[in-house]
Swiss-Prot record:
GO cellular component: cytoplasm
GO biological process: arginyl-tRNA aminoacylation
Family classification: Belongs to the class-I aminoacyl-tRNA synthetase family.
Main location: cytoplasm
Keyword Nucleotide-binding applies: yes
Catalytic activity: tRNA(Arg) + L-arginine + ATP = L-arginyl-tRNA(Arg) + AMP + diphosphate
This protein's name: Arginine--tRNA ligase
Keywords, alphabetical: Aminoacyl-tRNA synthetase, ATP-binding, Cytoplasm, Ligase, Nucleotide-binding, Protein biosynthesis
EC number of this enzyme: 6.1.1.19
Record's subcellular location: Cytoplasm
Length: 594
C-alpha cells in the first residue's frame, strides 16, 4: 500500500478538499500550500478519532475567528462513507469519527490475508551502522541500547521498502588496542605467579619500562575479563611457547601486537555471542585495520577539498570550522601517524563507494562533539548533508531498589550487556529490547531492573504479550485453528456499536499508520507506545461481559473473532518489528474470559 492510502491520510485528503472548497466560496485566492493543514489523533476520544487544529492555526492568515472558520470548513465535508460524524469543538477543532463499516473494510484490506505496510515513494539503499563497540572489552549497557535501537530501526526501514544493511565497525587499530595487549601481557605474568602492580599516577616512563617493572599502565585495562584472555593464551600451547620466547628476549613490541590481535579476536567473538543472544544480526563486521592496510586512510587528504586541508605546525589539519566545528582538527600527527578522525573519514568514504545512498550512524552519548567534524568531512568530499544522519543512543542508568547501579569500564566494576541478559533470565531478550525501546533514544533512560524482572502484567512487555496469548487461548478454547479459520466475507458494522468494540477496531485500523510514522521518524518508542495502547484497548474489550465470545453465536461470534484475530496480527507484527517474540501461551492467559 502507498502512504496516501493510510487511514489518517484519507481523512487529510478530505480535509484538504473541504478547505479548498471553503477558500473558493470565501473568494480567498491563496494556494493550499500557504496554509497549515494537518490531522492529529483526538486528545479526548469522546470527540472523535481524529481532529484538526486548522481553524486555530490559520486564523491570522484568514482574519476570521476559529469557530467561523471551522464551521465553514465543516459544511464542505460530504463523505458519508468515510465519516460517522464531523463536529466542531471549542476553541477551534474539527473532529472526525470514522464510520465502523469503513473501519472494518479498511482493516480487512490491510490486515488480510497478511499484514501489509505502507511503502515510501523514495526508496534508498541504506547502510545502518550501530553498536560498533570497541573490541577492548565486553559490550556495556549503552551498547545494548544501541543494539536494540539499531536492529528495530533496520526492521522499520525495511518495512518502508528501503534496502538496508546492518554494519558493525570494528575499531581494531590504534593505541587503545595496543594498550589492550599490554594489559593481557601483565595478566599473563600474574597468572604465572608473578606479582604485578597498578600505576595510579602517570609518569614519563615508557610502556616497555613499566612492563619490565611489572606495572600495568594507568591508561590500560584492568577488568577481570583480561584475566580470562590471559588464561586462554596460556592454555594454547603453541601461543604460550611463542609468548614465552618473546618475554625471554624482551621483544615487547612484537609480543604486544600479537596479544592485541588475539585479545581483539577473543573480545569480538564474545561480543558476537552476546548480540546473538539479544537477537541482533549484522550483515558485516567491518575492520578498521583493513582500511589502514589498503592505504585508504593515507588517501584521505586527496578526498577532501584542497582548501579544506592545511598543514599547521607540522600537523595536517582538516579545516572543520568551515563546517560548523568549534576548531580545526588534526588528521595526521607530526610523526606521520593518522588520527582516529582520519580513519573515520576513510571509513565513511568507503561506505559511499560501496553504493549506499544514505548513511545512518548510531553513536553513544559521549560522541556529540564528534558530529560536526565528520559531517563536515562528508560535505567536503562532495556528499549531501541529507545523505548522512547521525543518531545518538543516550546514557542508560540501571536502577535497582530505586537507586542507580554504578558502572566503570576500566576498573572492571561495570555491568555488561551479558550481565544484564543473565540477570533478566529466560526473558532477557524480549524484556531487554522492549525496555531499551520504551523511551526516545536521544533521552537518558532509567532501566528499572526490578520492573524488568517482574513477570506479571505490571511489566509492560508482558502486558502486551499476555494480550496476544489471550487471543490465542480464545481460539484454542473454541477449538478453532487460527491458520485455517476463514475470515467472514461480509462483516457488518452492526456488531461494533459498543464503546469497547469500536475503540479496539479503531486501534487495530491505526496499525499501518503507526508503523509508518514510527519508521519515517526513526523513533521505535512510538511503536512501543502504540502496542501498549492497543493491548489496553483489547484488555478493556476482553474484560467486558458482553464480549464473551464463547457465549456468542453465528454472525456476532464470527465478527468478534474477526476483530480479535486482527488485533493479534497487529500485536505480533509490531513486536516482530521490535525484535520481540509474541508467545501463543503464557501462564496468565489461562485466566480466560472467553
Amino acid at each position: 500500500m502507498k502512504a496516501n492510502q493510510l487511514l489518517k491520510n484519507l481523512v487529510l485528503t478530505e480535509l484538504e478538499s473541504a478547505v479548498s472548497s471553503y477558500l473558493t466560496k470565501q473568494k480567498i485566492d491563496l494556494p493550499l500550500t500557504e496554509f497549515k493543514i494537518r490531522i492529529e489523533y483526538s486528545r479526548d476520544e469522546k470527540f472523535g478519532d481524529y481532529s484538526s487544529p486548522f481553524a486555530l492555526e490559520n486564523k491570522n492568515i484568514l482574519k476570521l475567528n476559529p469557530k467561523e472558520i471551522a464551521e465553514g470548513v465543516l459544511s464542505e465535508i460530504k463523505n458519508e462513507t468515510l465519516f460517522e460524524f464531523v463536529t466542531f469543538s471549542p476553541p477551534g477543532f474539527i473532529n472526525f469519527r470514522i464510520r465502523s463499516q469503513f473501519l472494518i473494510q479498511y482493516t480487512n484490506q490491510v490486515m488480510s490475508p497478511m499484514v501489509t505496510f505502507a511503502k515510501t515513494d523514495e526508496k534508498q539503499s541504506i547502510l545502518l551502522e550501530f553498536v560498533s563497540a570497541n573490541p577492548t572489552g565486553p559490550m556495556n549497557i549503552v551498547s545494548a541500547r544501541s543494539a536494540a535501537y539499531g536492529d528495530a530501526l533496520a526492521n522499520l526501514l525495511l518495512s518502508l521498502g528501503h534496502t538496508v544493511k546492518r554494519e558493525f565497525y570494528v575499531n581494531d587499530y590504534g593505541n587503545q588496542v595496543y594498550l589492550l595487549g599490554v594489559a593481557v601481557l601483565l595478566r599473563i605474568f600474574e597468572e604465572k605467579g608473578e606479582k604485578i602492580s597498578f600505576q595510579e599516577d602517570e609518569s614519563k616512563e615508557s610502556v616497555f619500562t613499566l612492563i619490565e617493572k611489572r606495572i600495568l599502565p594507568k591508561e590500560s585495562y584492568r577488568g577481570e575479563y583480561i584475566r580470562d584472555i590471559a588464561k586462554e593464551v596460556l592454555s594454547n600451547k603453541t601461543k604460550s611457547i611463542q609468548v614465552e620466547e618473546w618475554i625471554q628476549n624482551k621483544n615487547w613490541d612484537e609480543c604486544i601486537h600479537d596479544l592485541s590481535k588475539y585479545a581483539v579476536e577473543y573480545n569480538l567473538s564474545r561480543q558476537k555471542e552476546d548480540l546473538k543472544l539479544f537477537g541482533v544480526h549484522f550483515d558485516q563486521f567491518f575492520s578498521e585495520r583493513s582500511l589502514h592496510e589498503a592505504g585508504d586512510v593515507e588517501n584521505v587528504p586527496t578526498l577532501l577539498k584542497k582548501e579544506d586541508v592545511s598543514t599547521i605546525d607540522g600537523k595536517l589539519h582538516f579545516l572543520s570550522t568551515q563546517y560548523g566545528d568549534d576548531k580545526d582538527r588534526v588528521i595526521r600527527r607530526e610523526d606521520g601517524r593518522p588520527t582516529y578522525l582520519m580513519a573515520d573519514i576513510a571509513y565513511h568514504f568507503d561506505k559511499y563507494k560501496r553504493g549506499f545512498t544514505k548513511l545512518i550512524d548510531i553513536w553513544g552519548p559521549d560522541h556529540y562533539g564528534y558530529i560536526a567534524r565528520l559531517k563536515g568531512a562528508v560535505l567536503s568530499f562532495g556528499k549531501s548533508n541529507d545523505s548522512f544522519l547521525i543518531l545518538i543512543a543516550q546514557q542508560v542508568n540501571l536502577i535497582e531498589n530505586k537507586e542507580k547501579v554504578k558502572m566503570s569500564k576500566r576498573l572492571g566494576i561495570f555491568q555488561t550487556m551479558r550481565d544484564l541478559l543473565s540477570y533478566l533470565g529466560k526473558n532477557g531478550k524480549d524484556v531487554g529490547r522492549y525496555f531499551f525501546l520504551m523511551r526516545s533514544s536521544d533521552a537518558p533512560l532509567d532501566f528499572d531492573l526490578d520492573l524488568a524482572k517482574d513477570e506479571s502484567d505490571k511489566n509492560p512487555v508482558f502486558y502486551i504479550q499476555y494480550a496476544h496469548a489471550r487471543i490465542c487461548s480464545i481460539f484454542r478454547e473454541l477449538q478453532i485453528s487460527i491458520a485455517d479459520w476463514s475470515i467472514p466475507k461480509v462483516v457488518s458494522g452492526d456488531c461494533f456499536q459498543s464503546e469497547e468494540r469500536l475503540r479496539l477496531l479503531f486501534w487495530v485500523a491505526r496499525f499501518q499508520e503507526e508503523v509508518y510514522d514510527t519508521a519515517t521518524n526513526l523513533e521505535p518508542h512510538r511503536l512501543t507506545n502504540y502496542l501498549q495502547s492497543l493491548s489496553k484497548a483489547f484488555t478493556k474489550f476482553y474484560s467486558h461481559k458482553d464480549n464473551r465470545i464463547k457465549e456468542k453465536q453465528g454472525e456476532e461470534r464470527e465478527q468478534l473473532l474477526f476483530l480479535i484475530l486482527f488485533t493479534k496480527r497487529a500485536i505480533a507484527s509490531g513486536l516482530e518489528l521490535l525484535g520481540i517474540s509474541s508467545p501463543e501461551k503464557m501462564s496468565k492467559e489461562d485466566e480466560s474470559n472467553t
